Amino acid sequence: MKAIIQKKIEHVNKIAGLLKEAKSFVVFEYSTMTAKAITALRRKVKTSANQMFVLKNNILKRAIKEAGIDGFDDDIKNQIAVVIGLEDAFLPIKAVHEYVTANEKVKYVCGYLENEKLSAAELSEIAVLPSRDELYSMFLSVLQAPVRKFMYALKAVADTKQQ
Protein backbone atom coordinates (compact mmCIF):
# COMPACT_ATOMS: atom_id res chain seq x y z
CA MET A 1 0.00 0.00 0.00
CA LYS A 2 2.83 2.41 0.82
CA ALA A 3 4.36 1.84 -2.61
CA ILE A 4 1.16 3.04 -4.28
CA ILE A 5 1.06 6.14 -2.08
CA GLN A 6 4.71 6.83 -2.88
CA LYS A 7 3.97 6.55 -6.62
CA LYS A 8 1.07 8.98 -6.26
CA ILE A 9 3.28 11.44 -4.37
CA GLU A 10 5.92 11.20 -7.12
CA HIS A 11 3.23 11.74 -9.76
CA VAL A 12 1.89 14.81 -7.92
CA ASN A 13 5.44 16.18 -7.62
CA LYS A 14 6.08 15.61 -11.34
CA ILE A 15 2.87 17.41 -12.35
CA ALA A 16 3.54 20.21 -9.84
CA GLY A 17 7.01 20.70 -11.31
CA LEU A 18 5.56 20.96 -14.80
CA LEU A 19 2.91 23.41 -13.61
CA LYS A 20 5.59 25.61 -12.00
CA GLU A 21 7.50 25.72 -15.30
CA ALA A 22 4.36 26.16 -17.40
CA LYS A 23 3.56 29.34 -19.26
CA SER A 24 -0.06 28.23 -19.37
CA PHE A 25 -2.33 25.28 -18.82
CA VAL A 26 -5.89 24.42 -19.77
CA VAL A 27 -8.22 22.14 -17.83
CA PHE A 28 -11.10 20.67 -19.81
CA GLU A 29 -13.72 17.93 -19.55
CA TYR A 30 -12.91 15.06 -21.87
CA SER A 31 -15.60 12.53 -20.97
CA THR A 32 -17.38 12.72 -24.33
CA MET A 33 -14.23 12.60 -26.46
CA THR A 34 -13.39 9.36 -28.21
CA ALA A 35 -10.06 7.68 -27.60
CA LYS A 36 -9.10 8.56 -31.17
CA ALA A 37 -9.81 12.27 -30.56
CA ILE A 38 -7.85 12.27 -27.29
CA THR A 39 -4.89 10.61 -29.03
CA ALA A 40 -5.05 13.16 -31.87
CA LEU A 41 -5.09 16.02 -29.35
CA ARG A 42 -2.15 14.48 -27.49
CA ARG A 43 -0.15 14.22 -30.73
CA LYS A 44 -0.96 17.79 -31.70
CA VAL A 45 0.05 19.12 -28.31
CA LYS A 46 3.27 17.09 -28.14
CA THR A 47 4.57 18.54 -31.41
CA SER A 48 6.12 21.27 -29.30
CA ALA A 49 7.28 21.14 -25.71
CA ASN A 50 3.78 20.83 -24.30
CA GLN A 51 2.17 17.90 -22.55
CA MET A 52 -1.30 16.51 -21.94
CA PHE A 53 -2.37 14.45 -18.95
CA VAL A 54 -5.61 12.74 -18.01
CA LEU A 55 -5.59 12.93 -14.22
CA LYS A 56 -7.72 12.15 -11.25
CA ASN A 57 -9.19 15.31 -9.78
CA ASN A 58 -7.49 14.83 -6.43
CA ILE A 59 -4.04 14.46 -8.01
CA LEU A 60 -4.49 17.60 -10.11
CA LYS A 61 -5.79 19.60 -7.14
CA ARG A 62 -2.79 18.57 -5.04
CA ALA A 63 -0.34 19.31 -7.86
CA ILE A 64 -1.82 22.76 -8.41
CA LYS A 65 -1.63 23.49 -4.68
CA GLU A 66 1.95 22.25 -4.51
CA ALA A 67 2.86 24.45 -7.48
CA GLY A 68 1.67 27.44 -5.44
CA ILE A 69 -1.35 28.26 -7.60
CA ASP A 70 -4.64 29.06 -5.87
CA GLY A 71 -8.29 29.20 -6.83
CA PHE A 72 -8.80 25.98 -8.79
CA ASP A 73 -10.35 23.67 -6.17
CA ASP A 74 -13.98 24.50 -6.94
CA ASP A 75 -13.61 24.14 -10.71
CA ILE A 76 -11.98 20.72 -10.87
CA LYS A 77 -14.68 18.07 -10.96
CA ASN A 78 -15.98 15.41 -13.39
CA GLN A 79 -13.58 13.74 -15.82
CA ILE A 80 -10.87 16.21 -16.65
CA ALA A 81 -7.65 16.46 -18.58
CA VAL A 82 -4.98 19.14 -18.52
CA VAL A 83 -2.81 20.45 -21.35
CA ILE A 84 0.35 22.16 -20.10
CA GLY A 85 2.17 24.71 -22.26
CA LEU A 86 5.87 24.77 -21.45
CA GLU A 87 7.15 26.83 -24.41
CA ASP A 88 4.20 28.33 -26.24
CA ALA A 89 1.60 29.77 -23.90
CA PHE A 90 -1.15 29.89 -26.52
CA LEU A 91 -0.77 26.54 -28.30
CA PRO A 92 -2.55 24.54 -25.55
CA ILE A 93 -5.46 26.98 -25.55
CA LYS A 94 -5.77 26.91 -29.34
CA ALA A 95 -5.38 23.11 -29.55
CA VAL A 96 -8.12 22.46 -27.00
CA HIS A 97 -10.30 25.14 -28.61
CA GLU A 98 -10.41 23.13 -31.86
CA TYR A 99 -11.92 20.20 -29.98
CA VAL A 100 -14.26 22.39 -27.94
CA THR A 101 -15.69 23.94 -31.11
CA ALA A 102 -15.88 20.60 -32.95
CA ASN A 103 -17.65 18.79 -30.12
CA GLU A 104 -20.08 20.84 -28.05
CA LYS A 105 -19.97 18.31 -25.21
CA VAL A 106 -16.25 18.95 -24.62
CA LYS A 107 -16.01 21.97 -22.33
CA TYR A 108 -13.32 24.23 -20.98
CA VAL A 109 -13.22 24.08 -17.21
CA CYS A 110 -10.60 26.74 -16.49
CA GLY A 111 -7.09 27.76 -17.40
CA TYR A 112 -3.98 29.57 -16.28
CA LEU A 113 -1.98 32.15 -18.23
CA GLU A 114 0.64 34.61 -17.02
CA ASN A 115 -0.06 34.00 -13.33
CA GLU A 116 -3.81 34.49 -13.72
CA LYS A 117 -6.67 32.06 -13.55
CA LEU A 118 -8.88 32.14 -16.63
CA SER A 119 -12.53 31.21 -16.89
CA ALA A 120 -13.98 29.17 -19.75
CA ALA A 121 -15.25 32.34 -21.43
CA GLU A 122 -11.83 33.99 -21.24
CA LEU A 123 -10.20 30.89 -22.72
CA SER A 124 -12.64 30.98 -25.65
CA GLU A 125 -11.82 34.64 -26.29
CA ILE A 126 -8.06 34.05 -26.15
CA ALA A 127 -8.26 31.02 -28.43
CA VAL A 128 -9.60 33.03 -31.37
CA LEU A 129 -6.88 35.68 -31.18
CA PRO A 130 -4.15 35.41 -33.84
CA SER A 131 -0.83 33.90 -32.81
CA ARG A 132 2.33 35.97 -32.45
CA ASP A 133 3.60 34.88 -35.89
CA GLU A 134 0.28 35.81 -37.49
CA LEU A 135 0.42 39.22 -35.80
CA TYR A 136 3.97 39.77 -37.09
CA SER A 137 2.90 38.93 -40.64
CA MET A 138 -0.11 41.28 -40.37
CA PHE A 139 2.15 44.06 -39.08
CA LEU A 140 4.69 43.54 -41.86
CA SER A 141 2.01 43.59 -44.53
CA VAL A 142 0.73 46.90 -43.12
CA LEU A 143 4.28 48.30 -43.27
CA GLN A 144 4.79 47.06 -46.82
CA ALA A 145 1.50 48.40 -48.21
CA PRO A 146 2.56 52.07 -48.70
CA VAL A 147 5.86 51.04 -50.28
CA ARG A 148 4.09 48.59 -52.57
CA LYS A 149 1.55 51.23 -53.68
CA PHE A 150 4.36 53.71 -54.34
CA MET A 151 6.20 51.09 -56.39
CA TYR A 152 3.09 50.43 -58.51
CA ALA A 153 2.63 54.18 -59.05
CA LEU A 154 6.24 54.53 -60.23
CA LYS A 155 5.82 51.55 -62.53
CA ALA A 156 2.64 53.07 -64.01
CA VAL A 157 4.46 56.37 -64.63
CA ALA A 158 7.36 54.51 -66.27
CA ASP A 159 4.94 52.54 -68.47
CA THR A 160 3.18 55.72 -69.64
CA LYS A 161 6.51 57.39 -70.48
CA GLN A 162 7.60 54.36 -72.53
CA GLN A 163 4.48 54.58 -74.69
From Swiss-Prot:
It comes from the Bacteria. One of its GO terms (biological process) is translation. One of its GO terms (molecular function) is large ribosomal subunit rRNA binding. Gene3D superfamilies: 3.30.70.1730, 6.10.250.290. Pfam families: Ribosomal_L10. Coiled coil: none annotated. GO terms for cellular component: ribonucleoprotein complex; ribosome. InterPro entries: Ribosomal_uL10, Ribosomal_uL10-like_sf, Ribosomal_uL10_bac, Ribosomal_uL10_bac_type. Keywords: Ribonucleoprotein, Ribosomal protein, RNA-binding, rRNA-binding. PANTHER family: 39S RIBOSOMAL PROTEIN L10, MITOCHONDRIAL. Belongs to the universal ribosomal protein uL10 family. Forms part of the ribosomal stalk, playing a central role in the interaction of the ribosome with GTP-bound translation factors. Part of the ribosomal stalk of the 50S ribosomal subunit. The N-terminus interacts with L11 and the large rRNA to form the base of the stalk. The C-terminus forms an elongated spine to which L12 dimers bind in a sequential fashion forming a multimeric L10(L12)X complex. This is Large ribosomal subunit protein uL10. The gene is rplJ.
